[in-house]
Structure formats: C-alpha cells, structure tokens
Amino acid sequence: MAKATTIKEALVKWEEKTGEKANDATAVKLYGQIPPIEKMDASLSNLVNCERLSLSTNCIEKIANLNGLKNLKILSLGRNNIKNLNGLEAVGDTLEELWISYNLIEKLKGIHVMKKLKVLYMSNNLVKEWGEFLKLADLPSLVDLVFVGNPLEEKYSADGNWIEEATKRLPKLKKLDGNPVIKQEEETEGES
C-alpha cells in the first residue's frame, strides 16, 4: 500500500498548484489527497493566516496540531476516520464552523471549548445518546446543526419526533438538518 501523504507534502503540492504561499493563504484545501493524509502533523502550524482549512476525504484519525492557526474560522474534516473531538481546544476561541460529517464520532467530549461555533455539520457519525447530544447545549453560538444519520437521529426520526425532541434540547437552533426550525408553541394551542 502507498505511503500516506504528509501535511508538508500536501502543502508543497498545494503551493505549486495555486502559486500561493501556505503561510500567507487565508484558505487552504488539502482534501482528497492520494495517497490520503493520515496525520494532522506539526506542518499545520505554518498556516498562521488560514481562516478556512479543508482536510476532508483523507484518513485522519485524530485532530491535532491546530495551535498555530490563530485565525481559523472554518475547519472541514468530513469523510475521515476521526473518533473524537480532542484537539479542537487550540481553535476554541476562533472556530465558527466545523464540518465533520462521515466520521466515527460517538462522544462529544471537548466540544464545550468551541465558544464561537455557529455551524456544526456532523451527519453520519455514531452518536447514540441524548447525554452526548446535550453537550451541544454548551455551545452558546450554535444555530445551525446537521445531525442526520447518527443512530440517535435515526431512532427518533423513525418515531417521527426527532425535530421536536432535538429542538426542545437545543432551543437556540435556527436550522436543523438543513431545515429552518419553526417554533410550534402557537400551533398547538388550538388543537384538542
């Protein structure tokens, strides 16, 4: 099997392709590397001006080495093999969007550090319990959540009450699974 691509190699390729210097760039796309990236190594710390980083469609297992990315607002890690959210604390003060769908995340420990997170796309992961889902209530800015394809969502959607149950637990959401959240208090008063 081919050796994994390192972040350093991927950045060299990206610089050649775009003609930009990685340490000056505000948006860096390292998605779908062949062979795939397996580790978020220390080379990431050179991306001091990066606001949008895409590492999706690789084989990354752990979030790491984000400490130099003082301006990071959008992090895309979809379609990897990430099992937990450890490592995000380095960007907890700046990150506004985390795209982490199609991974292996079961527990949301560590999400509470994301004080500015507005958008969380984490469909098709392995979250099974309300106890984990409730950790999202620690995110004061979260307004847009995609959670479809997690065992918890699938179970409650099958019963027809996912949206109601999820929005009851996260009342500040404006969008859930791509749909605007409609508050239902007014509608239920006239029903018997």
Swiss-Prot record:
Domain LRRCT: 150-192
Compartment(s) of residence: Cytoplasm, Cytoskeleton, Cilium axoneme
UniProt entry keywords in alphabetical sequence: Cell projection, Cytoplasm, Cytoskeleton, Dynein, Leucine-rich repeat, Microtubule, Motor protein, Repeat
GO MF, one example: dynein heavy chain binding
Gene that specifies this protein: dnal1
Any GO BP annotation: outer dynein arm assembly
Swiss-Prot/TrEMBL LRR repeat ranges: 49-70, 71-92, 94-115, 116-137
Stated family: Belongs to the dynein light chain LC1-type family.
UniProt miscellaneous comment: Outer (ODAs) and inner (IDAs) dynein arms contain the molecular motors that generate the force to move cilia by ATP-dependent reactions. There are two mechanosensory systems that monitor and respond to the mechanical state (curvature) of the axoneme. One system involves the central pair microtubule complex and radial spokes and the second system involves the outer dynein arms.
Pfam families (alphabetical): LRR_4 (PF12799)
InterPro entries reported in the protein's UniProt record: Leu-rich_rpt, Leu-rich_rpt_4, LRR_dom_sf
Functional description taken from the UniProt entry: Part of the multisubunit axonemal ATPase complexes that generate the force for cilia motility and govern beat frequency. Component of the outer arm dynein (ODA). May be involved in a mechanosensory feedback mechanism controlling ODA activity based on external conformational cues by tethering the outer arm dynein heavy chain (DNAH5) to the microtubule within the axoneme.
Assembly information from the UniProt record: Interacts with DNAH5, a outer arm dynein heavy chain. Interacts with tubulin located within the A-tubule of the outer doublets in a ATP-independent manner.
Cellular component aspect of the GO annotation: cell projection; cytoplasm; dynein complex; microtubule
Name under which the protein is recorded: Dynein axonemal light chain 1
PROSITE patterns per the UniProt record, alphabetical: LRR (PS51450)
Location, primary (coarse class): cytoplasm
Keyword Transferase: no
